[in-house]
């Protein structure tokens, strides 16, 4: 399998180095779809109340465990969707993503939404990985 990052010269550069405009995979044999991950511990407790960075770090650790279960890593992620309750948390989210997605980052969409499944949750992410 080969991975090619797509950032054409005539397309605006990504605002942050934690995503690419596109990702092309060839010869991928398996796709892994990671459901929306949130900042919850294994007992269902919200982690990092009122702290978007802490929540992003926890949900990315949860995502890492799901990817590992499939035999994948963050290097295999081709698409990431981010759902934020407050766009003022944009910088905190990208700071957390930078721990996982600086080398050949995935394509990504980030949107603000009115609420998540629990009132203390500030961010949710889902992903697609290719193996």
Language-model regions: role of each:
Residues 1-61, 65-78, 84-131:
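N-terminal presequence-like segments and the immediate start of the first folded domain
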């Amino acid at each position: 399998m080969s991975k090619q990052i797509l950032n054409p010269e005539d397309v605006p550069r990504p605002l942050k180095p934690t995503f690419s405009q596109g990702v092309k995979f060839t010869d991928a044999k398996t796709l892994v779809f990671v459901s929306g991950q949130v900042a919850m511990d294994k007992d269902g407790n919200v982690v990092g109340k009122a702290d978007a960075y802490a929540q992003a770090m926890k949900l990315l650790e949860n995502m890492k465990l799901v990817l590992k279960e499939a035999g994948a890593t963050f290097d295999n992620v081709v698409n990431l969707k981010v759902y934020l309750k407050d766009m003022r948390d944009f910088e905190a989210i990208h700071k957390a993503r930078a721990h996982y997605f600086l080398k050949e980052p995935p394509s990504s969409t980030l949107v603000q939404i009115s609420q998540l499944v629990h009132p203390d949750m500030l961010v949710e992410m889902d992903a697609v990985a290719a193996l």
